[in-house]
Amino acid sequence: MVYAAPVWKVYLRANVESRGAEIRDVIVPEFYGHVKRLINHPEASWILDDIYRGVASSQQKAILLREWYGPEFAIFKTADPSKATAELSSILKESPEKRKPIMEHLKHLINQLIQKKMTGFTMLHDAMLQYFLNTTPGTEEASSFLEIITPTPASNKEQKEEADNEPEIDLLKNLAFTSSGSRVVCLALTYSSAKERKQIIRAYKDTIEALAFDPNGHRVLLTAYDVFDDTRQLSTSIFNELIGKDASEAQQQKVLELASHGTGRLAILYPFAGTAKWLLPDTELVRIEEVHKIRETTSKKEPETRRLELVKSLSSACLDTIASQAESLLQSSFGCQFISEVLLGSEGDKSQALASVAEAAAGDPKEEGHVAQSPFGGRMIKTLVLGGRFDPKTKKVTLVQPPLDFHNIFYGRVKDHVVDWACTASSLVVVNMLEAEGFSHKDDLLKQLKKGKKSLSQAASEAGADANGKKQKKKAPGNVGAKMLLEKL
């Protein structure tokens, strides 16, 4: 097979994309039997990996990856290609006697590419994951693999400068941005010693922000949060780069960008919300559960203690951001979730942040764009008014300590429009104020509602959405919150 020039990568990709599966099934098999030769070539390797990553079907990927396990997988074709598997555990289970030659061949090929600094290939990352998953923790095999990817500690400035050019640094940075590669890094962090974890995270200096916004890279940060016992060191390595060390407008802007980004928010909300399903999809939860199970024997600190220490490190920056950027945060569901989690879970003085949220919710709630008009805004205000999260097991609200007292702050800003609030889709906010523990304006609120009884009756009798602003399959007659308030009157 003749090695293709770089232009052929574009040509092959364009051909497959324009002509579909038919041409794909002609082109991809041409690479079978040549993987080891191609992956070691400076130009052909990129073509092979591009085809593997972006063109080949799952079965074709399996056939190509199998060639990393030894010459026999390249020479002898699978009788039924549709049943070919690249899962090394399945292959070793079927032929346990082949374990030693397969693992040696795989490790040798992995080492070759790392030493050549050809570490950006998805195929390499998939192969490394298969190798790591089939080692036994604590064995020489597993330890030597960790040594391959863990940078050597540097004791002085000159050594540190040299260390920045180590192949392990280049490898770790590339691994973090693919699915299999990020899992390799996460497992390495989880199984490593405290000293090795520090070296691994140090490799991502000047890359932390990119990790936070990446669909694969952020997992490295979440794993570090879960396994580091030295949270002060972790805060220095990650948070100082992610959001800045000192309070400033630049820091607040960084926090705002993270909080408003679908992936970026995980890096800043995970210490507050943990494994909440609204924050993490099922695929993320599976990876996190894997880490949590392993850390039981590899980390010393209690998980809740670790989490609270991370929350303490983030609290000041997050509260400052809410205090200065409340209006911007209230414009999106992500921003509202950020406000709720931080105000309920952070440490420190929350008064300015609470006042800013209440001020941003002031004004006529009937106006377009007002927080009362959005389901996510209404839910956030309702949660803060209650002063805690609703526990479905006890059917009660678990209040935060010390109390937020948001209901009293909020009422001071919306008193003149409280009847209008009671007639909007966010009417349950007013219901919750009446029911909230420690609300000192109950009599005044009831007085205001009695004055607006006519408006409440009209809202309660009109057909429309429910009190949370959600469309119902069958339209309910009237505003649920307004009805509840009329009953209380």
Regions found by a protein language model. Name each.
Residues 1-489:
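Eukaryotic gene-expression regulator signature that favors modular helical reader/repeat domains
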